From Swiss-Prot:
Pfam families per the UniProt record, alphabetical: PB1 (PF00564), Pkinase (PF00069)
Name of the protein in its database record: Dual specificity mitogen-activated protein kinase kinase 5
Lineage: Eukaryota, Metazoa, Chordata, Craniata, Vertebrata
Entry comment, domain topic: Binds MAP3K2/MAP3K3 and MAPK7 via non-overlapping residues of the PB1 domain. This domain also mediates interactions with SQSTM1 and PARD6A.
Entry's Gene Ontology BP terms: cellular response to growth factor stimulus; ERK5 cascade; heart development; insulin-like growth factor receptor signaling pathway; MAPK cascade; negative regulation of canonical NF-kappaB signal transduction; negative regulation of cell migration involved in sprouting angiogenesis; negative regulation of chemokine (C-X-C motif) ligand 2 production
Origin species: Rattus norvegicus (Rat)
Family membership noted in the UniProt record: Belongs to the protein kinase superfamily. STE Ser/Thr protein kinase family. MAP kinase kinase subfamily.
Lineage: superkingdom: Eukaryota
Location of region: Disordered: 116-144
Length: 448
């Protein structure tokens, strides 16, 4: 059996190993190891001890190809586990599959108490048997777990995401101020989306933007896109986020109301979450609403960084067609301005066209200010009642009131009959619609 183990071990000598330590009832912690084949049983127990300091752990388990749990209590059993895992990784690489972390399950552990261990990352570059300490790893943070502010500083200081670890694949789209790519993160084996924005700003402003982006690590909502990190290379900022295989809503045609209702619920919940953190989105529009084939709906590109918002505005001159009248007029911006943008976005998604026919959005949503003056001067557009339900028409009408204070507050949005009607957790409706739309798009494009 020894010669069988040598092949995978030698092949994986320079490969980063990510061990996912499963915590009972509390999620998981990822541990990145740069000397995987030399890893000893005691090394793993030491790290488990850091993750679960209140428990006594003498062994751990992993799952084989049949899903059976195999116990590891010694270096010999540790080598057998690594050999099995590396063989699996080599098969995944040959088949072009994504590499999954090695999952282990600590044994004889008491559940951890209320401690701030969520999102802990451990990174060891040391040789075997050397004790490790919790520092930031190269693996992607789990966007379902919150991070402490101390860890955030480590993440940004250690450059968790960097260009050398990213392989760009396809161009997903060109937004206002940047290009979005589908990319592969080598250390973790994850697919992600990377938005690259060219900015003519000073090094000091770059540092301020990175500091402001820290709050994205604290976002813990299933309706907000997962944020993995950001970095500057010269005058380009790259923002790395979760990849959504359905893309943004601006590329879809007219959306049926029963689908749009479920999407609206998710968007309102996402906005309400941001507002609870005192974050204004500032750029609510269909291209910043993402969907996937699982039926999830998530918001992206919200204005957590004032400096980034201002820098993009200075670099890319124009006015957003989804802006509320008070923003176009240069007045104060608030939650109610986001609500207007919510209303005009869903009106467009329902109609299949921009609600103001005199405004042509063929060249994107940025345009000269004078073209948008009609939004300030004219009455708000209204949906035809015979074509849509009364609750939906009322929802849009309320969101698009010209006076900001007359628009619904966050709690009023969640309690609106249109939102209540579709707040049933039925992701299957959105999933089926996304899958069908993607299939139609592929059939129209024909074979490559």
């Amino acid at each position: 059996m020894l010669w069988l183990a040598l092949g995978p071990f030698r092949a994986m000598e320079n490969q980063v190993l990510v061990i996912r330590i499963k915590i009972p009832n509390s999620g998981a912690v990822d541990w990145t190891v740069h000397s995987g084949p030399q890893l000893l049983f005691r090394d793993v127990l030491d790290v488990i001890g850091q993750v679960l300091p209140e428990a006594t752990t003498t062994a751990f388990e992993y799952e084989d190809e049949d899903g059976d749990r195999i116990t590891v209590r010694s270096d010999e059993e540790m080598k057998a586990m690594l050999s099995y895992y590396y063989s699996t990784v080599m098969e995944q690489q040959v088949n072009g599959q994504l590499i999954e972390p090695l999952q282990i399950f600590p044994r004889a552990c008491k559940p951890p108490g209320e401690r701030n261990i969520h999102g802990l990352k451990v990174n060891t570059r040391a040789g075997p048997s050397q004790h490790t300490s919790p520092v930031v790893s190269d693996s992607l943070p789990s966007n379902s777990l919150k991070k402490s502010s101390a860890e955030l500083r480590k993440i940004l200081a250690n450059g968790q995401m960097n260009e050398q670890d990213i392989r760009y694949r396809d161009t997903l789209g060109h937004g206002n101020g940047g290009t979005v790519y589908k990319a592969y993160h080598v250390p973790s084996g994850k697919i992600l989306a990377v938005k690259v924005i060219l900015l003519d700003i000073t090094l000091e402003l770059q540092k301020q933007i990175m500091s402001e982006l820290e709050i994205l690590y604290k976002c813990d909502s299933s309706y907000i896109i997962g944020f993995y990190g950001a970095f500057f290379v010269e005058n380009r900022i790259s923002i790395c986020t979760e990849f959504m295989d359905g893309g943004s809503l601006d590329v879809y045609r007219k959306i049926p109301e029963h689908v749009l209702g479920r999407i609206a619920v998710a968007v309102v919940k996402g906005l309400t979450y941001l507002w609870s953190l005192k974050i204004l989105h500032r750029d609510v529009k269909p291209s910043n609403m993402l969907v996937n084939t699982s039926g999830q709906v998530k918001l992206c590109d919200f204005g957590v960084s004032t400096q980034l918002v201002n820098s993009i505005a200075k670099t890319y001159v124009g006015t957003n067609a989804y802006m509320a009248p008070e923003r176009i007029s240069g007045e104060q911006y608030g939650i109610h301005s986001d609500v207007w943008s919510l209303g005009i976005s869903f009106m467009e998604l329902a109609l299949g066209r921009f609600p103001y026919p005199q405004i042509q959005k063929n060249q994107g949503s940025l345009m000269p200010l004078q073209l948008l003056q009609c939004i300030v001067d004219e009455d708000s557009p209204v949906l035809p009642l015979g074509e849509f339900s009364e609750p939906f028409v009322h929802f849009i009408t309320q969101c698009m009131r010209k006076q900001p204070k007359e628009r619904p507050a966050p709690e009023e949005l969640m309690g609106h009959p249109f939102i209540v009607q579709f707040n049933d957790g039925n992701a299957t409706v959105v999933s089926m619609w996304v899958c069908r739309a993607l299939e139609e798009r592929r059939s129209q494009q024909g074979p490559p």
